[in-house]
A protein has these predicted regions:
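N-terminal Rossmann-like FAD-binding beta1-loop-alpha1 element of flavoenzymes
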Residues: 231-258, 385-393
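A Rossmann-like FAD-binding core segment of flavoenzymes
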Residues: 290-332, 337, 393-494, 536-540
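N-terminal Rossmann-like dinucleotide/flavin-binding domain of flavoprotein oxidoreductases
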Residues: 155-192, 205, 211-212, 269-329, ...
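A conserved FAD-binding loop/helix module that cradles the flavin
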Residues: 386-388, 503, 509-541
Length: 541
């Protein structure tokens, strides 16, 4: 990314007089006068509007759950407050107070802010770029958002850190073994070691060893699900296919909700770099691509509920209903199944015991830091495996790649060539994982691979093993309503609409659909194509 100082004009732009007058038409209320030092919006305030300053100043600060604050900037006339959370009415990560002489400002609640961005393409581009860059700055600088207190690199810390990072939320890890504010808080709160990690939400609330769902609830990022509200489209899955549906459907005026049990991006979101996606000649990370699509969906008014697990689809009578965890319900006139696939796990004893303790199914910057300078192994021969190899190899001493057959049968040529040029990558063909061993702390210590040709076993000492061996369809929750093939993928196209399943009004796109091309671009294409078929359905109902 460019030097932060060079992006300041884009991060904190000043609207012209003409742009301010145009923006007035979209304000959610009359201009308001704030006294010197008065709170304009507070850290953690949900639904806080963005404010367009007409005169005076607003001093913006960041803070965390330990009540540590630091200045970010001072907005003047023609500038506006807020960051990405203001698009969806989520709790503010930053706070603002009127300057020494007070200020006058116009409010734009989430709906009116989105209306302004859509109503004026010029102003919308300025605002969207600024909101995204401000979030990036908050993540890069730290000192804002959620604090995780525990042992860095532990399975529990990694899981929460992955959720926050892939959700684009700033976070900081404090080592409980080092005396400081984190350890002091643990001792003060009487938190035992088996209750770690301790999580401090931006508002100061403490969570002991929370799940990602509990953390999301504390952060206020899960919208309220109204069982009586009828959406035009409910999308299950926030990967490339699901987010594409959300963007196109919402931009065409349909009411849309997207639900995902984990985080945005799906399996593609874990890709370190996608180099063959149209329009990105230098490549783009899966997380960056998902983040852009996520913000684009918010811009057009789509509701996104993450992490919310959909447990079953009810399709026997009345509107289609998604039954979620804790019996929460979402009703819609159409349902798009974009739930993708689940990571496939090899049949190896005790595998689950090492997940998060040395065994991983994705490769992000977090994993790269953990295995820096070490010998690691990776199993898999598809494009996702290739992208992970190219990303991880510069960080590690040696990367052993284990595949069952020649890479030319399963991987794109550009990745094969890139891997061949990496001096620290060893390719082991025809060897399969057969056993795992742990150390006294329960972390991975070694892996044994068996050669298929003669059964010879070889043991490798290693603390990090990455598994990229494909995926199985994530469609079990919908099988009571839709037909699947023998492998569990959802069948579509029996009627006049190619992406509609055996149940009218229920569509399947992306990796979960039988016969689909397992590529990000193909998933995005299906996400766009399904919207026209939904329009056709709704026009007949």
């Amino acid at each position: 990314m460019s030097d932060p100082d060079t992006r300041a004009p884009q991060m904190f732009p000043v609207l012209s007089h003409a742009q301010i007058e145009l923006a007035r038409r979209f304000a959610s209320g009359p201009e308001h006068r704030f006294a010197p030092g008065e709170t304009v919006y507070a850290i953690g305030e949900r639904g806080a509007p963005a404010w367009l300053i007409l005169d005076g100043e607003i001093k913006v600060t960041r803070g965390d759950g330990l009540d540590r604050t630091a200045p970010i900037t001072v907005h003047g006339a023609g500038q506006f407050t807020g960051e990405v959370n203001q698009l969806a009415g989520r709790p503010s990560i930053a706070g603002g107070h009127a300057g020494d002489l007070g200020c006058t400002a116009l409010p734009f609640d989430p709906a009116h802010l989105r209306a302004l961005m859509i109503g004026s393409a010029e102003i919308g581009e300025i605002i969207m770029r600024a909101l995204i860059l401000r979030r990036v700055r908050l993540i890069e600088q730290g000192g804002a958002g959620t604090i995780l207190i525990g042992i860095p690199g532990s399975a529990e810390i990694i899981a929460l850190q992955e959720f926050l990072t892939r959700s684009g939320l700033p976070n900081l890890v404090l080592d409980v073994r080092v005396y400081g504010e984190g350890r002091a808080l643990v001792e003060q709160a009487g938190v035992s070691s088996d209750e770690l990690p301790l999580v401090v939400c931006p508002g100061g609330a403490l969570l002991r060893r929370p799940t990602s769902v509990e953390l999301a609830a504390c952060l206020g990022i899960i919208p309220d699900l109204d069982p009586d509200h009828l959406y035009d489209v409910a999308v299950v899955g926030a990967g490339p296919a699901g987010l594409a549906t959300a963007v196109y459907a919402a931009s065409e005026g349909l009411s849309v909700i997207v639900l995902d049990a984990r985080t945005m991006g799906g399996q593609a979101g874990a890709s370190a770099r996608i180099e063959n996606y149209l329009g990105f000649p230098t490549g783009i990370s899966g997380q960056a691509l998902a983040g852009r699509a996520f913000n684009q969906a918010l811009k057009f008014g789509a509701e996104i509920a993450i992490p919310v697990a959909v447990e079953r689809l009810v399709c026997d009578a009345g509107p289609l209903t998604l039954v979620c965890a804790e019996e929460r319900r979402v009703s819609a006139r159409s349902v798009v199944i974009a739930s993708g696939a689940q990571y496939r796990r090899p049949d190896v004893p005790n595998l689950a015991a090492f997940e998060g303790k040395g065994v991983a199914y994705w490769a992000s910057a977090i994993e790269a830091r953990l295995c820096a300078g070490e010998d690691i192994a990776l199993v898999g021969g598809g494009n996702s495996a290739g992208q992970a190899i190219v990303f991880l190899a510069p960080f590690v001493r040696t990367l052993r790649l284990f595949v069952r057959r020649d890479l030319s049968e399963t991987m794109s040529r550009y990745l094969i060539d890139r891997i061949a040029a990496l001096p620290n990558v060893e390719i082991h063909s025809g060897e399969e994982l057969s056993a795992l061993e742990g150390d006294e702390a329960g972390n991975l210590a070694a892996a044994t691979f068996r050669r298929a040709a003669d059964g010879e076993a070889r043991r490798y000492a290693l603390r990090h093993l990455f598994l990229f061996i494909g995926a199985d369809p994530n469609a079990g929750w919908a099988r009571d309503c839709v037909a699947t093939d023998e492998d569990g993928f959802i069948v579509s196209g029996a009627g006049s609409r190619s992406l509609e399943t055996s149940r009218a009004g229920v569509f399947a796109i992306g990796d979960v659909r039988a016969g689909s091309t397992k590529r990000v671009a193909a998933a995005v294409g299906e996400g766009a194509a399904v919207v026209s078929q939904i329009h056709s359905l709704l026009a007949q109902s």
